[in-house]
Amino acid sequence: ASCLVGSEMCIRDRVELRQRPWNRNYVGTHFGGSLFAMTDPFWMLLVMQNLGRDYYVWDKAGSIDFIKPGRGTVTADFVLDNAILDTLRSATESGEKYLHWFDTDVHDLSGDVVARVRKQLYIKRKPQR
């Protein structure tokens, strides 16, 4: 979906994970692997779709920090604006690789942060043919 950040257009995706018996851990909260997995592909997909076919985009690294137990439905928002895309384009215009970290908070229905996820992407402009 499109959105505005200040006066800039941006792209926004929201992911939702409902708690079920198969994603619940031994103590009855969301399994940490499910919280990480719900966020896994989205930064790479958003960047690939918006930079276009002239770029290599790969997941490089990731981490998760568990803030509080996640219960019920949890959500994560991904907002990619033109300023980030401009940074990625300018950092790779000479053909060098660029590593960029993206941060995403996972919230419960009360709006409390239950986890902070970081994903690092490898981005490189493809050679001209």
Show where each model-derived region lies.
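Single conserved hydrophobic/aromatic residue that forms the stacking wall/gate
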Residues: 1-6, 10-11
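Hydrophobic residues positioned within well-ordered beta-strands of beta-sheet architectures
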Residues: 15, 60-62, 76, 100-102, ...
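Hot-dog-fold acyl-thioester-processing enzymes
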Residues: 23-42, 56
